Every structure is written in C-alpha cells, then in structure tokens.
Swiss-Prot record:
Reported consequences of knocking out the gene: Casp6-knockout mice are grossly normal, breed with Mendelian ratio, and are only slightly protected from anti-Fas/CD95-induced cell death. Casp6-deficient neurons undergo apoptosis and exhibit soma and axon degeneration just as wild type neurons. While Casp6-deficiency is able to block axon degeneration with local deprivation, it is incapable of doing so with global deprivation. In addition, B-cell differentiation into plasma cells is accelerated in deletion mutants compared to wild-type. Casp6-knockout mice are more susceptible to influenza virus infection.
GO terms under biological process: activation of innate immune response; cellular response to staurosporine; epithelial cell differentiation; hepatocyte apoptotic process; intrinsic apoptotic signaling pathway by p53 class mediator; positive regulation of apoptotic process; positive regulation of necroptotic process; protein autoprocessing
Known catalytic reactions: Strict requirement for Asp at position P1 and has a preferred cleavage sequence of Val-Glu-His-Asp-|-
Tissue expression profile of the protein: Highly expressed in lung, liver, kidney, testis, and heart. Lower levels in spleen, skeletal muscle and brain. Expressed in neurons.
GO cellular component: cytoplasm; cytosol; nucleoplasm; nucleus
CDD domains documented for this protein: CASc
Protein's UniProt name: Caspase-6
Active site, per annotation: 104, 146
Positions of post-translational Phosphoserine modification: 62, 239
Length: 276
C-alpha cells in the first residue's frame, strides 16, 4: 500500500505558486523573549536598545493580526515553562506561529537571564509529534543574537553613500558570542540577525540593525510581499549599513549580513484578515 500511495502522490499536480492557508480564525501567537540584563555570573553585558526592538516588533506583529506576548529577562526555567505552555495549547484555528529571541547567543544556544538554552530544545516543542495543531503551518523563529568573532569587512561601491547618524550617543554595540544555523523540520523558518561567524550590531537607542530593518519592511510590505522575499529585502537593507560610532575602534566601518534558513514548503503571505 505504501508503494501504491507513493505512486499516486507522484502523479499529483504540482503547483509552484501554492500558498499556506491564512484564512483561519486567528493569525496566531507571536512570542517575544526579550533579554536586556543577565545574571552577573554569566559576565554578559547589558543589551541596551533591546527594548526598542521589543516595542517595534510588538507594533508590527500586532498590525499583521498576531496575538503578541512579550516576556522580559526570564530565567531559563520560566522561559521553558512559557514556551511549553504555548506548544501544548491548541493552534487549530491559527494560521501560524512566531517566536522571537532578543538576547546573546553561543553555539546552538541562546541565553535566558541565568542560563543558556539549546535552540533545538525550543524548536523541538513545535514539531509535529509534539504540537499537532501546527502541523503543515508555518513556524517562524527569529533570533537576534551575535553568531561569531568576526566583523564583515566592507567592500563599498564608489557611488554608494553610507547612512550617517546625527546622534553621537546612539552608539553601536555587538551581541556576545555565536549562534549556529540549525535545521528544525518541515514548515519551519529560521531567521538569523547575522550570518554564522560574524557579529550582530545593536544601537543603544534605536535597537538592533536587523530588527530595525525587519520592522521597516514589515510596515511597508508585511501584508503584500511573500515573506521570504521580504527577508531578502531585509538582508539588503542591513548589508548597506556600517558601524559609525563604537567603543571598539576595530568595529568602525564594519558591516553585517543577516541570513535565513527556510524549510517552508509553500509560499507565505500574511494576507490582511477581514475586519471584525
């Protein structure tokens, strides 16, 4: 029977334009885990500017119809409890799910207030055997964290003029350590603020480059452009930035390029929902 089923499946019409269904009652939940301060024993610096990222993302996701839930500086045990509660709740009437981490990172981990958590532990809670109501639906993880010990050396076209900030107190900082690109499974989309092995930049007033530009693109094209195409625009926007003011002189002039790993199987559009 398995061979017969496979034979008939191979004969099905393949539609390259097929989209995820976004006509459920709810858009879905968007979790934002925001970490500004850390337990002193971790010796991690404060992430000044991260609250601007949190607020910016809250506005953008709310505009797209998501139920946004923000959590600040949770301990690892608290964070795991929150995300387990969401993974075991019903998403049957939801279009999709989003989870955002604004923190420091290292290897295949991100940091909560007092300890690091393996990313695959988090994504694993939303795989089909653990969260059946999200089977076949987009599961988007956005990770704003540093991913290495290198800066991207700029090679700038002669006719390009880089943006200069007017406020000297809006200093650029980097998020500590590194995060690896991780596979998660079908219908997952892993979005990273920077390519593996490089620094992720964050302004102390305006927030991180990646989240600033992601939110700008969501505001302009969030309900009209296919989401991975929108992420490509974000890559372009961030890559056009450079560090102008930083306490580390070696960082001046350096650049950044985000990346995303898509395991989506259809096109993803956040089509506007009918007014209630």
């Amino acid at each position: 029977m398995t061979e017969t089923d496979g034979f008939y499946k191979s004969r099905e019409v393949f539609d390259p334009a097929e989209q995820y269904k976004m006509d459920h009652k709810r858009r879905g939940v968007a979790l934002i885990f925001n970490h500004e301060r850390f337990f002193w024993h971790l010796t991690l610096p404060e992430r000044r500017g991260t609250n601007a990222d949190r607020d910016n993302l809250t506005r953008r996701f709310s505009d797209l119809g998501f139920e946004v839930k923000c959590f600040n500086d949770l301990r690892a045990e608290e964070l795991l409890l929150k995300i387990h509660e969401v993974s075991t709740s019903s998403h049957i009437d939801a279009d999709c799910f989003i989870c955002v981490f604004l923190s420091h990172g290292e290897g295949n981990h991100v940091y909560a207030y007092d300890a690091k958590i393996e990313i695959q532990t988090l994504t694993g809670l939303f795989k089909g055997d653990k969260c059946q109501s999200l089977v076949g639906k987009p599961k988007i993880f956005i990770i704003q964290a540093c991913r290495g010990s290198q800066h991207d050396v700029p090679v700038v076209p002669l006719d390009m003029v880089d943006h200069q900030t007017d406020k000297l107190d809006n200093v650029t900082q980097v998020d500590a350590a590194s995060v690896y690109t991780l596979p998660a499974g079908a219908d997952f989309l892993m979005c990273y603020s920077v390519a593996e092995g490089y620094y992720s930049h964050r302004e102390t007033v305006n927030g991180s480059w990646y989240i600033q530009d992601l939110c700008e693109m969501l505001a302009r094209y969030g309900s009209s452009l296919e989401f991975t195409e929108l992420l490509t625009l974000v890559n372009r926007k961030v890559s056009q930035r450079r560090v102008d003011f930083c306490k580390d002189p070696d960082a001046i002039g350096k650049k950044q390029v985000p990346c995303f790993a898509s395991m989506l199987t259809k096109k993803l559009h956040f089509c506007p929902k009918p007014s209630k």
